């Protein structure tokens, strides 16, 4: 979650800010199509912050916020990056002391795997 002050600062720097509420109850495929069009062939750094997911999916973080993205939406974002010029990426904010069930680590590992699958030059089966 970010404050409106942080969001306005990011907008001034040219970032597009999408609040979680704008993503509720919908596919993120149209958003990813717009991002792909805007990014073109430019370099992309893909960063996933686990606390952007709803804590029902990933409770093991220091800053859980209800109303976050679903697992399916996170996958739409990552898979929507296929074919883009990804130059790096990361997944942050998993906190093992708060991950009592291990679910967050499992979600994080799967999302990292998905991120590796969309790197340039990865071969896909049809």
Residue map of PLM features:
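Active-site glycine-rich loop that binds ribose-phosphate moieties when present
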Residues: 1-5, 24-27
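Catalytic cores of soluble, metal-dependent hydrolases
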Residues: 16-126
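Active-site-proximal loop/helix segment associated with metal-binding centers of metalloenzymes
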Residues: 2-18
């Amino acid at each position: 979650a970010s404050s409106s002050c942080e969001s306005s600062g990011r907008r001034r720097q040219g970032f597009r800010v999408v609040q979680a509420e704008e993503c509720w109850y919908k596919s993120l495929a149209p958003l990813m199509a717009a991002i792909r069009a805007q990014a073109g062939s430019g370099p992309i750094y893909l960063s996933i912050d686990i606390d952007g997911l709803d804590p029902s999916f990933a409770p093991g973080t220091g800053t859980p916020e209800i109303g976050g993205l679903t697992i399916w939406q996170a996958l739409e974002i990552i898979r929507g990056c296929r074919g883009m010029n990804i130059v790096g990426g990361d997944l942050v904010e998993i906190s093992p002391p708060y991950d009592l069930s291990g679910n967050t680590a499992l979600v994080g590992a799967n999302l990292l795997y998905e991120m590796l699958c969309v790197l340039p030059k990865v071969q896909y089966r049809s």
